[in-house]
Amino acid sequence: DTETTDENTNTLTVCIDAGHGGKDNGSEAEGRIEKDDTLKIALAVESYLKSQNINVVMTRTEDIFWKLSKRCSIANDANADYFVSLHRNIGEGYGVETWVSHTADEEANALAKNILSELETVGIARNRGVKAGSQSNPEEDFIVNRDSNMASCIVELGFLNVPDDNQNFDNHLDEYAKAIGDAIIKTAQTYQPDKMGI
C-alpha cells in the first residue's frame, strides 16, 4: 500500500522510552519502583500523542528488560524524529530536569526546554533546567542520548525519595503526559513543520 508509506513519511514519529523494566528496577525508595512509574507515564504520553494523530513507537509497553542499545535501535530503526526517555530521579534535591547530549543541536535543546516549560504550567516542585552530558561528566553522554540518531532527551520526573514530587507525579499523571506531548508537538511545529502538515 504505497499511500500508507507516503503518509508515514509525512507524519511525525516519536519514540517514547519508559526507563528501566524487567530485572532492572531503576531507583527504589520506600517500596516505590522507578520502572513502574516510567511505564505509567510512558503509556499516558503514548495515548495522548496518538489522540493528536502522532505516530508513536514505544520501547516497551510492559514490564520487560531491554538493553540501552536495543532502546536506541528501536528509535533508529523506526526513523523516529524524536526520542524521549522517561525516568524518575533519586538523591539530594527535588523537582524535574531534562538531559541532552553535550553535542545536542538546537532542536534537541528546544525539545528538552519545551518539556520543562509545559510541565511547569501543570505544576512541578522546581524546574531544575536542561543539563548536558551526565551527572559524572558533562562531556560523557547517557547512552540513549549518545546513540540515538534524532533529537533526544531524558526527562527526570521528580525524585522518588521526595514525597512532594511523588504526590505531583501521582496527582498530575495525565496532565504531565499531555504536557510532554504538547512540548513534543510544539517543538515539531517549529523544527519539523512539513511533518506536522504546516
Give the residues covered by each predicted segment.
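Non-catalytic propeptide/linker segments at domain boundaries
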Residues: 1-12
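Polar low-complexity intrinsically disordered regions enriched in Ser/Thr and small residues
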Residues: 4-6, 29, 161
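Glycine- and acidic-residue-enriched helix-capping/strand-helix junction motifs
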Residues: 25-40
